[in-house]
UniProtKB/Swiss-Prot annotation:
The gene is opaD. One of its GO terms (cellular component) is plasma membrane. CDD domains: MFS_Azr1_MDR_like. It is found in: Membrane. GO terms for molecular function: transmembrane transporter activity. This is MFS-type transporter opaD. Glycans are attached at residue 382.
Length: 587
Protein backbone atom coordinates (compact mmCIF):
# COMPACT_ATOMS: atom_id res chain seq x y z
CA UNK A 1 0.00 0.00 0.00
CA UNK A 2 2.84 2.36 0.86
CA UNK A 3 4.49 1.71 -2.51
CA UNK A 4 1.19 2.21 -4.29
CA UNK A 5 0.62 5.50 -2.50
CA UNK A 6 4.19 6.61 -3.17
CA UNK A 7 3.89 5.99 -6.90
CA UNK A 8 0.53 7.74 -7.07
CA UNK A 9 1.75 10.66 -4.97
CA UNK A 10 4.84 11.17 -7.14
CA UNK A 11 2.80 10.95 -10.34
CA UNK A 12 0.22 13.47 -9.13
CA UNK A 13 2.82 15.76 -7.58
CA UNK A 14 4.69 15.95 -10.89
CA UNK A 15 1.48 16.70 -12.72
CA UNK A 16 -0.07 19.25 -10.42
CA UNK A 17 2.33 20.24 -7.64
CA UNK A 18 5.47 21.79 -9.17
CA UNK A 19 5.84 23.98 -6.10
CA UNK A 20 6.41 21.16 -3.58
CA UNK A 21 10.18 21.60 -3.73
CA UNK A 22 9.72 24.91 -1.94
CA UNK A 23 7.79 23.49 1.02
CA UNK A 24 9.37 23.47 4.44
CA UNK A 25 9.86 20.19 6.26
CA UNK A 26 7.09 21.13 8.65
CA UNK A 27 4.56 21.09 5.86
CA UNK A 28 5.13 17.37 5.13
CA UNK A 29 2.85 16.47 8.04
CA UNK A 30 -0.01 18.04 6.13
CA UNK A 31 0.84 15.75 3.18
CA UNK A 32 1.11 12.38 4.92
CA UNK A 33 -1.34 13.11 7.74
CA UNK A 34 -1.85 10.80 10.75
CA UNK A 35 0.11 7.57 10.56
CA UNK A 36 -2.70 5.07 10.29
CA UNK A 37 -3.84 2.83 7.49
CA UNK A 38 -7.30 4.35 7.03
CA UNK A 39 -6.01 7.87 6.49
CA UNK A 40 -3.33 6.69 4.10
CA UNK A 41 -5.88 4.92 1.95
CA UNK A 42 -8.15 8.00 1.94
CA UNK A 43 -5.29 10.26 0.93
CA UNK A 44 -4.17 7.85 -1.76
CA UNK A 45 -7.61 7.95 -3.27
CA UNK A 46 -7.75 11.77 -3.17
CA UNK A 47 -4.24 13.05 -3.98
CA UNK A 48 -5.63 16.23 -5.50
CA UNK A 49 -6.26 17.60 -1.98
CA UNK A 50 -2.62 17.44 -0.98
CA UNK A 51 -1.68 20.94 -2.07
CA UNK A 52 -4.63 22.68 -0.49
CA UNK A 53 -3.12 23.38 2.91
CA UNK A 54 0.18 25.24 2.26
CA UNK A 55 -0.95 28.68 1.07
CA UNK A 56 0.91 31.43 2.85
CA UNK A 57 3.28 29.67 5.21
CA UNK A 58 5.26 27.74 2.57
CA UNK A 59 8.37 29.81 3.16
CA UNK A 60 11.93 28.71 3.83
CA UNK A 61 14.54 31.06 5.21
CA UNK A 62 18.04 30.51 3.92
CA UNK A 63 20.82 32.00 5.96
CA UNK A 64 23.87 33.21 4.12
CA UNK A 65 26.36 36.03 3.83
CA UNK A 66 23.81 38.12 1.98
CA UNK A 67 21.34 37.95 4.87
CA UNK A 68 17.99 36.23 5.06
CA UNK A 69 16.58 35.28 1.70
CA UNK A 70 13.00 34.06 1.54
CA UNK A 71 12.12 31.45 -1.08
CA UNK A 72 8.37 31.31 -1.49
CA UNK A 73 6.35 28.71 -3.27
CA UNK A 74 4.12 30.06 -5.98
CA UNK A 75 0.83 30.89 -4.26
CA UNK A 76 -2.43 29.22 -5.09
CA UNK A 77 -4.31 30.67 -8.01
CA UNK A 78 -6.04 33.81 -6.80
CA UNK A 79 -9.24 35.07 -8.33
CA UNK A 80 -8.37 38.61 -9.39
CA UNK A 81 -11.01 41.05 -10.53
CA UNK A 82 -11.94 41.05 -14.25
CA UNK A 83 -10.61 43.89 -16.35
CA UNK A 84 -13.81 45.94 -16.41
CA UNK A 85 -14.09 45.77 -12.64
CA UNK A 86 -10.41 46.70 -12.19
CA UNK A 87 -10.91 49.76 -14.37
CA UNK A 88 -14.01 50.84 -12.44
CA UNK A 89 -12.31 50.35 -9.06
CA UNK A 90 -9.20 52.18 -10.26
CA UNK A 91 -11.28 55.14 -11.42
CA UNK A 92 -12.82 55.29 -7.95
CA UNK A 93 -9.42 55.04 -6.25
CA UNK A 94 -7.94 57.70 -8.54
CA UNK A 95 -10.77 60.13 -7.77
CA UNK A 96 -10.24 59.78 -4.02
CA UNK A 97 -6.43 59.93 -4.19
CA UNK A 98 -6.62 62.99 -6.44
CA UNK A 99 -8.90 64.79 -3.96
CA UNK A 100 -6.63 63.81 -1.09
CA UNK A 101 -3.54 65.02 -2.98
CA UNK A 102 -5.26 68.24 -4.08
CA UNK A 103 -5.96 69.06 -0.45
CA UNK A 104 -2.20 69.45 0.04
CA UNK A 105 -2.00 72.32 -2.46
CA UNK A 106 -5.48 73.65 -3.19
CA UNK A 107 -5.37 76.21 -0.37
CA UNK A 108 -2.18 77.87 -1.66
CA UNK A 109 -4.22 80.47 -3.56
CA UNK A 110 -7.24 80.45 -1.23
CA UNK A 111 -5.53 81.26 2.08
CA UNK A 112 -5.51 85.06 1.55
CA UNK A 113 -9.31 85.08 1.23
CA UNK A 114 -9.73 82.74 4.20
CA UNK A 115 -7.58 84.89 6.47
CA UNK A 116 -9.45 87.97 5.28
CA UNK A 117 -12.85 86.43 6.13
CA UNK A 118 -11.81 85.01 9.50
CA UNK A 119 -9.32 87.78 10.36
CA UNK A 120 -6.85 85.02 11.19
CA UNK A 121 -3.46 85.76 9.66
CA UNK A 122 -1.83 84.19 12.72
CA UNK A 123 -3.56 80.85 11.97
CA UNK A 124 -2.81 80.52 8.27
CA UNK A 125 0.18 78.23 8.82
CA UNK A 126 -2.08 75.75 10.59
CA UNK A 127 -4.45 75.48 7.62
CA UNK A 128 -1.73 73.49 5.88
CA UNK A 129 0.12 72.06 8.88
CA UNK A 130 -2.95 70.51 10.54
CA UNK A 131 -3.60 68.45 7.42
CA UNK A 132 0.05 67.49 6.99
CA UNK A 133 0.60 66.55 10.64
CA UNK A 134 -2.50 64.37 10.82
CA UNK A 135 -1.73 62.71 7.50
CA UNK A 136 1.87 61.88 8.38
CA UNK A 137 1.28 60.77 11.97
CA UNK A 138 -1.53 58.36 11.06
CA UNK A 139 0.25 56.59 8.19
CA UNK A 140 1.77 53.80 10.28
CA UNK A 141 -1.44 53.46 12.28
CA UNK A 142 -3.28 52.55 9.09
CA UNK A 143 -0.50 50.18 8.12
CA UNK A 144 -1.11 48.28 11.34
CA UNK A 145 -4.91 48.38 11.12
CA UNK A 146 -4.84 47.00 7.58
CA UNK A 147 -3.03 43.92 8.87
CA UNK A 148 -5.90 42.89 11.13
CA UNK A 149 -8.97 44.45 9.54
CA UNK A 150 -10.55 44.10 6.13
CA UNK A 151 -9.06 46.65 3.74
CA UNK A 152 -12.48 47.42 2.25
CA UNK A 153 -13.92 48.67 5.52
CA UNK A 154 -10.73 50.43 6.61
CA UNK A 155 -10.86 52.28 3.28
CA UNK A 156 -14.53 53.21 3.74
CA UNK A 157 -13.84 54.44 7.29
CA UNK A 158 -10.92 56.56 6.06
CA UNK A 159 -13.07 57.93 3.24
CA UNK A 160 -15.81 58.90 5.70
CA UNK A 161 -13.25 60.68 7.90
CA UNK A 162 -11.89 62.57 4.90
CA UNK A 163 -15.36 63.55 3.70
CA UNK A 164 -16.48 64.50 7.21
CA UNK A 165 -13.44 66.71 7.65
CA UNK A 166 -14.08 68.32 4.26
CA UNK A 167 -17.68 69.06 5.25
CA UNK A 168 -16.54 70.66 8.52
CA UNK A 169 -14.05 72.80 6.58
CA UNK A 170 -16.69 73.84 4.07
CA UNK A 171 -19.21 75.00 6.68
CA UNK A 172 -16.65 76.22 9.24
CA UNK A 173 -17.83 79.43 10.94
CA UNK A 174 -14.38 80.33 12.27
CA UNK A 175 -10.69 79.56 12.00
CA UNK A 176 -10.64 76.95 14.80
CA UNK A 177 -13.36 74.89 13.11
CA UNK A 178 -11.42 75.01 9.84
CA UNK A 179 -8.25 73.77 11.53
CA UNK A 180 -10.14 70.92 13.23
CA UNK A 181 -11.72 69.96 9.91
CA UNK A 182 -8.32 69.94 8.23
CA UNK A 183 -6.93 67.61 10.91
CA UNK A 184 -9.85 65.21 10.47
CA UNK A 185 -9.42 65.29 6.69
CA UNK A 186 -5.71 64.55 7.04
CA UNK A 187 -6.48 61.57 9.27
CA UNK A 188 -8.78 60.14 6.62
CA UNK A 189 -6.53 61.08 3.71
CA UNK A 190 -3.68 59.03 5.14
CA UNK A 191 -5.88 55.93 5.18
CA UNK A 192 -7.13 56.57 1.64
CA UNK A 193 -3.60 56.62 0.26
CA UNK A 194 -2.28 53.55 2.09
CA UNK A 195 -5.46 51.53 1.47
CA UNK A 196 -5.53 52.42 -2.23
CA UNK A 197 -2.11 50.91 -2.87
CA UNK A 198 -3.13 47.83 -0.87
CA UNK A 199 -6.36 47.43 -2.87
CA UNK A 200 -4.21 47.35 -6.02
CA UNK A 201 -2.43 44.26 -4.64
CA UNK A 202 -5.80 42.54 -4.26
CA UNK A 203 -7.45 43.32 -7.60
CA UNK A 204 -4.49 42.70 -9.94
CA UNK A 205 -1.60 40.19 -10.02
CA UNK A 206 1.87 41.33 -9.08
CA UNK A 207 3.12 41.67 -12.67
CA UNK A 208 0.41 44.24 -13.46
CA UNK A 209 0.75 46.32 -10.29
CA UNK A 210 3.52 48.66 -11.52
CA UNK A 211 1.14 50.16 -14.10
CA UNK A 212 -1.58 50.75 -11.53
CA UNK A 213 0.87 52.10 -8.96
CA UNK A 214 2.28 54.43 -11.61
CA UNK A 215 -1.18 55.81 -12.31
CA UNK A 216 -1.84 56.48 -8.63
CA UNK A 217 1.61 58.03 -8.12
CA UNK A 218 1.15 60.33 -11.11
CA UNK A 219 -1.85 61.95 -9.42
CA UNK A 220 0.44 63.61 -6.88
CA UNK A 221 2.33 65.30 -9.69
CA UNK A 222 -0.91 66.42 -11.32
CA UNK A 223 -2.26 67.83 -8.07
CA UNK A 224 0.90 69.89 -7.59
CA UNK A 225 -0.07 72.12 -10.53
CA UNK A 226 -3.83 71.90 -10.68
CA UNK A 227 -4.36 72.31 -6.92
CA UNK A 228 -3.43 76.01 -6.80
CA UNK A 229 -5.17 76.67 -10.13
CA UNK A 230 -8.39 75.03 -8.94
CA UNK A 231 -8.21 76.79 -5.58
CA UNK A 232 -7.74 80.14 -7.28
CA UNK A 233 -10.67 79.51 -9.63
CA UNK A 234 -13.01 78.57 -6.79
CA UNK A 235 -11.89 81.57 -4.75
CA UNK A 236 -12.26 84.06 -7.61
CA UNK A 237 -15.47 82.81 -9.22
CA UNK A 238 -17.39 81.10 -6.38
CA UNK A 239 -16.12 80.79 -2.81
CA UNK A 240 -13.08 79.23 -1.16
CA UNK A 241 -15.46 76.80 0.57
CA UNK A 242 -15.81 74.92 -2.72
CA UNK A 243 -12.19 73.82 -2.23
CA UNK A 244 -13.75 71.43 0.30
CA UNK A 245 -17.28 70.95 -1.03
CA UNK A 246 -15.87 69.46 -4.23
CA UNK A 247 -14.66 66.45 -2.22
CA UNK A 248 -18.19 65.45 -1.18
CA UNK A 249 -19.69 64.30 -4.50
CA UNK A 250 -16.38 62.78 -5.57
CA UNK A 251 -16.19 60.84 -2.30
CA UNK A 252 -19.75 59.67 -2.76
CA UNK A 253 -18.95 58.25 -6.20
CA UNK A 254 -15.82 56.56 -4.87
CA UNK A 255 -17.63 55.01 -1.91
CA UNK A 256 -20.42 53.71 -4.17
CA UNK A 257 -17.99 51.97 -6.54
CA UNK A 258 -15.92 50.45 -3.73
CA UNK A 259 -18.97 49.16 -1.85
CA UNK A 260 -20.56 47.78 -5.00
CA UNK A 261 -17.60 46.32 -6.87
CA UNK A 262 -14.76 45.61 -4.46
CA UNK A 263 -15.12 42.23 -2.79
CA UNK A 264 -14.52 42.24 0.96
CA UNK A 265 -11.28 40.37 1.57
CA UNK A 266 -10.11 38.61 4.68
CA UNK A 267 -7.51 40.24 6.96
CA UNK A 268 -3.98 39.10 6.23
CA UNK A 269 -3.44 38.18 9.87
CA UNK A 270 -5.82 36.78 12.47
CA UNK A 271 -6.38 38.26 15.91
CA UNK A 272 -4.74 36.38 18.80
CA UNK A 273 -6.83 35.41 21.82
CA UNK A 274 -6.71 37.55 24.96
CA UNK A 275 -6.94 41.30 25.40
CA UNK A 276 -3.26 41.72 26.34
CA UNK A 277 -2.10 39.79 23.27
CA UNK A 278 -4.36 41.86 21.04
CA UNK A 279 -2.99 45.13 22.43
CA UNK A 280 0.55 43.87 21.89
CA UNK A 281 -0.29 42.88 18.32
CA UNK A 282 -1.60 46.39 17.61
CA UNK A 283 1.64 47.81 19.05
CA UNK A 284 -0.32 50.45 20.97
CA UNK A 285 2.75 51.47 22.99
CA UNK A 286 4.83 51.97 19.86
CA UNK A 287 2.13 54.02 18.15
CA UNK A 288 1.64 56.25 21.18
CA UNK A 289 5.38 56.95 21.16
CA UNK A 290 5.73 57.40 17.41
CA UNK A 291 2.93 59.94 16.92
CA UNK A 292 4.27 62.54 19.41
CA UNK A 293 7.80 61.96 18.07
CA UNK A 294 6.68 62.73 14.53
CA UNK A 295 4.54 65.71 15.52
CA UNK A 296 7.44 67.16 17.55
CA UNK A 297 9.83 66.78 14.61
CA UNK A 298 7.45 68.45 12.16
CA UNK A 299 6.79 71.33 14.56
CA UNK A 300 10.53 71.85 15.01
CA UNK A 301 10.96 72.01 11.24
CA UNK A 302 8.04 74.40 10.85
CA UNK A 303 8.73 76.75 13.78
CA UNK A 304 12.52 76.66 14.02
CA UNK A 305 14.08 79.85 12.70
CA UNK A 306 10.72 81.37 11.72
CA UNK A 307 8.20 81.57 14.53
CA UNK A 308 10.84 80.92 17.20
CA UNK A 309 14.66 81.18 17.16
CA UNK A 310 16.47 77.86 17.15
CA UNK A 311 17.71 78.44 20.70
CA UNK A 312 14.21 79.26 22.00
CA UNK A 313 12.83 77.13 24.84
CA UNK A 314 9.92 75.95 22.68
CA UNK A 315 12.23 74.52 20.02
CA UNK A 316 14.62 72.98 22.54
CA UNK A 317 11.71 71.32 24.37
CA UNK A 318 10.32 69.91 21.12
CA UNK A 319 13.74 68.55 20.13
CA UNK A 320 14.02 66.90 23.55
CA UNK A 321 10.55 65.35 23.23
CA UNK A 322 11.43 64.06 19.78
CA UNK A 323 14.72 62.55 20.95
CA UNK A 324 13.22 60.76 23.96
CA UNK A 325 10.13 59.45 22.20
CA UNK A 326 11.91 58.25 19.05
CA UNK A 327 14.49 56.34 21.12
CA UNK A 328 11.73 54.82 23.22
CA UNK A 329 9.85 53.92 20.03
CA UNK A 330 12.94 52.18 18.61
CA UNK A 331 13.33 50.19 21.85
CA UNK A 332 9.67 49.13 21.80
CA UNK A 333 9.89 48.07 18.15
CA UNK A 334 12.96 45.95 18.91
CA UNK A 335 11.12 44.35 21.83
CA UNK A 336 7.99 43.71 19.77
CA UNK A 337 9.91 42.16 16.84
CA UNK A 338 7.35 40.76 14.34
CA UNK A 339 4.46 42.39 16.21
CA UNK A 340 6.01 45.84 15.81
CA UNK A 341 4.52 48.56 13.64
CA UNK A 342 7.89 48.65 11.86
CA UNK A 343 9.23 45.10 12.30
CA UNK A 344 13.04 45.05 12.67
CA UNK A 345 13.16 42.19 10.15
CA UNK A 346 11.64 44.54 7.57
CA UNK A 347 14.29 47.19 8.18
CA UNK A 348 17.04 44.57 7.94
CA UNK A 349 15.76 43.57 4.51
CA UNK A 350 18.07 45.35 2.09
CA UNK A 351 15.35 45.64 -0.56
CA UNK A 352 13.17 47.57 1.89
CA UNK A 353 15.73 49.95 3.38
CA UNK A 354 17.17 50.54 -0.07
CA UNK A 355 13.71 51.48 -1.34
CA UNK A 356 13.18 53.80 1.63
CA UNK A 357 16.51 55.56 1.01
CA UNK A 358 15.64 55.91 -2.68
CA UNK A 359 12.21 57.32 -1.77
CA UNK A 360 13.63 59.72 0.81
CA UNK A 361 16.18 61.26 -1.57
CA UNK A 362 13.93 61.43 -4.62
CA UNK A 363 10.96 62.85 -2.70
CA UNK A 364 13.20 65.51 -1.18
CA UNK A 365 14.38 66.53 -4.64
CA UNK A 366 10.83 66.64 -6.02
CA UNK A 367 9.48 68.84 -3.22
CA UNK A 368 12.25 71.38 -3.82
CA UNK A 369 11.40 71.83 -7.49
CA UNK A 370 7.66 71.77 -6.82
CA UNK A 371 8.04 74.82 -4.59
CA UNK A 372 10.98 76.72 -6.08
CA UNK A 373 10.27 76.49 -9.80
CA UNK A 374 7.11 78.63 -9.37
CA UNK A 375 9.14 81.06 -7.25
CA UNK A 376 11.65 81.43 -10.08
CA UNK A 377 8.87 82.07 -12.58
CA UNK A 378 7.20 84.65 -10.33
CA UNK A 379 10.35 86.51 -9.29
CA UNK A 380 12.53 86.31 -12.41
CA UNK A 381 9.90 86.13 -15.16
CA UNK A 382 7.36 88.31 -13.32
CA UNK A 383 4.64 85.68 -13.79
CA UNK A 384 1.44 85.70 -11.77
CA UNK A 385 0.67 82.83 -9.39
CA UNK A 386 -1.67 81.30 -11.94
CA UNK A 387 0.75 81.73 -14.84
CA UNK A 388 3.62 80.25 -12.83
CA UNK A 389 1.49 77.14 -12.41
CA UNK A 390 0.92 77.01 -16.15
CA UNK A 391 4.66 77.41 -16.78
CA UNK A 392 5.26 74.47 -14.44
CA UNK A 393 3.08 72.14 -16.52
CA UNK A 394 6.00 70.67 -18.59
CA UNK A 395 7.48 69.18 -15.41
CA UNK A 396 4.17 67.87 -14.12
CA UNK A 397 3.13 66.31 -17.41
CA UNK A 398 6.56 64.71 -17.82
CA UNK A 399 6.36 63.14 -14.36
CA UNK A 400 2.76 61.98 -14.77
CA UNK A 401 3.13 60.48 -18.24
CA UNK A 402 6.49 58.85 -17.53
CA UNK A 403 5.16 57.33 -14.28
CA UNK A 404 2.39 55.64 -16.23
CA UNK A 405 4.71 54.54 -19.06
CA UNK A 406 7.25 53.25 -16.55
CA UNK A 407 4.56 51.22 -14.81
CA UNK A 408 3.47 49.78 -18.15
CA UNK A 409 7.07 48.92 -19.06
CA UNK A 410 7.70 47.14 -15.76
CA UNK A 411 4.41 45.28 -16.17
CA UNK A 412 5.49 44.20 -19.67
CA UNK A 413 9.15 43.39 -19.01
CA UNK A 414 8.95 42.35 -15.38
CA UNK A 415 12.12 44.09 -14.18
CA UNK A 416 12.04 47.31 -12.16
CA UNK A 417 15.69 47.82 -11.23
CA UNK A 418 16.79 49.26 -14.63
CA UNK A 419 14.22 52.04 -14.31
CA UNK A 420 15.29 52.77 -10.74
CA UNK A 421 18.91 53.09 -11.90
CA UNK A 422 17.85 55.42 -14.71
CA UNK A 423 15.96 57.73 -12.36
CA UNK A 424 18.89 59.27 -10.41
CA UNK A 425 21.02 59.53 -13.55
CA UNK A 426 18.46 61.37 -15.69
CA UNK A 427 16.88 63.35 -12.85
CA UNK A 428 20.22 64.62 -11.52
CA UNK A 429 21.24 65.74 -15.02
CA UNK A 430 17.92 67.54 -15.49
CA UNK A 431 18.16 69.14 -12.05
CA UNK A 432 21.73 70.20 -12.73
CA UNK A 433 20.64 71.88 -15.95
CA UNK A 434 17.85 73.67 -14.07
CA UNK A 435 20.49 75.05 -11.72
CA UNK A 436 22.12 76.80 -14.71
CA UNK A 437 19.16 79.16 -15.09
CA UNK A 438 20.01 82.81 -15.66
CA UNK A 439 17.78 85.86 -15.58
CA UNK A 440 17.84 85.79 -19.36
CA UNK A 441 16.96 82.07 -19.73
CA UNK A 442 14.24 81.68 -22.36
CA UNK A 443 11.44 79.21 -23.07
CA UNK A 444 13.53 76.46 -24.69
CA UNK A 445 15.71 76.17 -21.59
CA UNK A 446 13.09 76.18 -18.85
CA UNK A 447 10.71 73.95 -20.80
CA UNK A 448 13.32 71.44 -21.96
CA UNK A 449 15.12 71.14 -18.62
CA UNK A 450 11.82 70.63 -16.79
CA UNK A 451 10.87 67.82 -19.17
CA UNK A 452 14.24 66.08 -18.73
CA UNK A 453 14.01 66.25 -14.95
CA UNK A 454 10.38 65.11 -15.03
CA UNK A 455 11.23 62.09 -17.17
CA UNK A 456 13.92 61.06 -14.70
CA UNK A 457 11.60 61.40 -11.71
CA UNK A 458 8.68 59.66 -13.40
CA UNK A 459 10.71 56.60 -14.35
CA UNK A 460 11.16 55.52 -10.75
CA UNK A 461 8.91 57.55 -8.46
CA UNK A 462 6.30 54.81 -7.98
CA UNK A 463 8.64 51.81 -8.07
CA UNK A 464 9.57 51.58 -4.35
CA UNK A 465 5.99 50.45 -3.75
CA UNK A 466 6.47 47.78 -6.41
CA UNK A 467 9.60 46.57 -4.60
CA UNK A 468 7.67 46.40 -1.32
CA UNK A 469 4.81 44.47 -2.90
CA UNK A 470 7.18 42.06 -4.65
CA UNK A 471 9.35 41.49 -1.57
CA UNK A 472 7.14 41.31 1.51
CA UNK A 473 4.68 38.65 2.58
CA UNK A 474 0.95 39.30 2.48
CA UNK A 475 0.59 40.31 6.14
CA UNK A 476 3.48 42.81 6.01
CA UNK A 477 2.69 44.56 2.71
CA UNK A 478 0.40 47.06 4.44
CA UNK A 479 3.12 48.09 6.90
CA UNK A 480 5.68 48.34 4.09
CA UNK A 481 3.35 50.48 1.99
CA UNK A 482 2.69 52.76 4.96
CA UNK A 483 6.42 53.08 5.58
CA UNK A 484 7.08 54.18 1.98
CA UNK A 485 4.32 56.80 2.03
CA UNK A 486 5.50 58.05 5.43
CA UNK A 487 9.05 58.40 4.07
CA UNK A 488 7.74 60.49 1.18
CA UNK A 489 5.97 62.85 3.59
CA UNK A 490 8.92 63.16 5.95
CA UNK A 491 11.33 63.89 3.12
CA UNK A 492 9.02 66.57 1.79
CA UNK A 493 8.71 68.23 5.19
CA UNK A 494 12.43 68.06 5.98
CA UNK A 495 13.86 69.24 2.67
CA UNK A 496 11.28 71.96 2.26
CA UNK A 497 12.76 73.60 5.33
CA UNK A 498 16.33 72.81 4.24
CA UNK A 499 15.62 74.53 0.92
CA UNK A 500 14.08 77.50 2.70
CA UNK A 501 17.19 77.90 4.86
CA UNK A 502 19.52 77.68 1.84
CA UNK A 503 17.41 80.16 -0.11
CA UNK A 504 17.29 82.78 2.64
CA UNK A 505 21.00 82.50 3.41
CA UNK A 506 22.13 82.70 -0.23
CA UNK A 507 19.69 85.51 -1.02
CA UNK A 508 21.06 87.74 1.72
CA UNK A 509 24.64 86.96 0.63
CA UNK A 510 23.85 87.71 -3.02
CA UNK A 511 22.05 90.95 -2.17
CA UNK A 512 25.07 92.17 -0.22
CA UNK A 513 27.26 91.36 -3.22
CA UNK A 514 24.99 92.68 -5.99
CA UNK A 515 23.34 95.63 -4.24
CA UNK A 516 25.21 96.56 -1.05
CA UNK A 517 23.29 99.82 -0.72
CA UNK A 518 19.96 98.03 -0.27
CA UNK A 519 18.48 96.64 2.93
CA UNK A 520 18.98 92.92 2.26
CA UNK A 521 16.85 91.82 5.20
CA UNK A 522 13.89 93.95 4.13
CA UNK A 523 14.02 92.68 0.54
CA UNK A 524 14.27 89.06 1.68
CA UNK A 525 11.23 89.43 3.94
CA UNK A 526 9.15 91.21 1.29
CA UNK A 527 8.81 88.13 -0.90
CA UNK A 528 9.59 87.24 -4.49
CA UNK A 529 6.47 88.73 -6.07
CA UNK A 530 6.98 92.33 -4.91
CA UNK A 531 10.69 92.90 -5.50
CA UNK A 532 9.99 95.16 -8.46
CA UNK A 533 7.70 97.34 -6.32
CA UNK A 534 10.03 98.00 -3.39
CA UNK A 535 13.29 98.93 -5.14
CA UNK A 536 14.25 101.59 -7.65
CA UNK A 537 13.91 100.51 -11.29
CA UNK A 538 17.65 100.83 -11.87
CA UNK A 539 18.31 98.37 -9.00
CA UNK A 540 15.85 95.72 -10.21
CA UNK A 541 18.40 93.86 -12.43
CA UNK A 542 20.79 93.48 -9.48
CA UNK A 543 18.02 92.21 -7.20
CA UNK A 544 16.87 89.75 -9.86
CA UNK A 545 20.40 88.41 -10.24
CA UNK A 546 20.52 87.90 -6.47
CA UNK A 547 17.19 86.06 -6.52
CA UNK A 548 18.30 83.93 -9.45
CA UNK A 549 21.52 82.99 -7.65
CA UNK A 550 19.70 82.03 -4.44
CA UNK A 551 17.07 79.95 -6.23
CA UNK A 552 19.59 78.09 -8.38
CA UNK A 553 21.62 77.22 -5.24
CA UNK A 554 18.46 75.55 -3.95
CA UNK A 555 18.23 73.66 -7.24
CA UNK A 556 21.72 72.30 -6.60
CA UNK A 557 20.39 70.74 -3.38
CA UNK A 558 17.66 69.11 -5.45
CA UNK A 559 20.22 67.84 -7.95
CA UNK A 560 22.37 66.37 -5.16
CA UNK A 561 19.37 64.58 -3.67
CA UNK A 562 18.40 63.17 -7.06
CA UNK A 563 21.93 61.80 -7.49
CA UNK A 564 21.95 60.43 -3.93
CA UNK A 565 18.90 58.31 -4.77
CA UNK A 566 21.36 56.02 -6.57
CA UNK A 567 22.65 54.91 -3.15
CA UNK A 568 19.23 53.46 -2.45
CA UNK A 569 19.11 51.44 -5.67
CA UNK A 570 22.44 49.66 -5.20
CA UNK A 571 21.39 47.35 -2.31
CA UNK A 572 18.10 46.33 -3.96
CA UNK A 573 18.31 42.86 -5.48
CA UNK A 574 17.52 42.39 -9.14
CA UNK A 575 14.07 40.89 -9.27
CA UNK A 576 11.05 40.63 -11.47
CA UNK A 577 7.37 41.05 -10.80
CA UNK A 578 6.95 38.01 -13.05
CA UNK A 579 8.89 35.87 -10.61
CA UNK A 580 12.17 35.90 -12.54
CA UNK A 581 15.50 36.65 -10.93
CA UNK A 582 18.88 37.69 -12.34
CA UNK A 583 21.44 35.99 -10.14
CA UNK A 584 24.35 38.10 -11.33
CA UNK A 585 22.73 41.20 -9.96
CA UNK A 586 21.90 39.78 -6.59
CA UNK A 587 25.21 40.47 -4.95
Amino acid sequence: MARKFGRRFRRNSRASLPSLKFLTLGSTDSVFGPHNQQHREEEANAPQEIALKPVEENVQTLLGSEGDVECRAPPQQQDYAPTWKCVAIMIALCLAVLCMALDNTILATAIPKITEEFNSVHDMGWYVSAYMLAQSSMTLVYGKLLTYYTVKWVYIAALLLFEGGSLICGVSPNSIALIIGRAISGTGGSGILVSSFLIVTIIVPVEKRPLYNGILSSLYAISGVFGPLLGGAFTDYATWRWCFYINLPVGGVTGFFILLLFRADKPTKQWPTGAVSQLLELDIIGLFLFIPALVSLLLVLQWGGSKYPWDDAHIIALIAVFGVTILAFAAVEYWQQDRATIPPSMIRNRDIWGSLLFTFCLSGSVIIFNYYLPIWFQSIKNASATMSGVMNIPLILAVALTSILSGWAVTTLGYYIPFMYATPVIASVGAGLLSTFKVSSAHPAWIGFQILYGIGVGLGFGLPLVVVQATLTAHTISSGTALVTLTQGLAGALFNFVAQSVFQTKLVQALFAEAPSLDAGKIAEAGATVVRDIVDPDMVPAVLRAYNYAITRVYLVGAALAAAALLGVVPIRWGSVKGKKIEAGAA
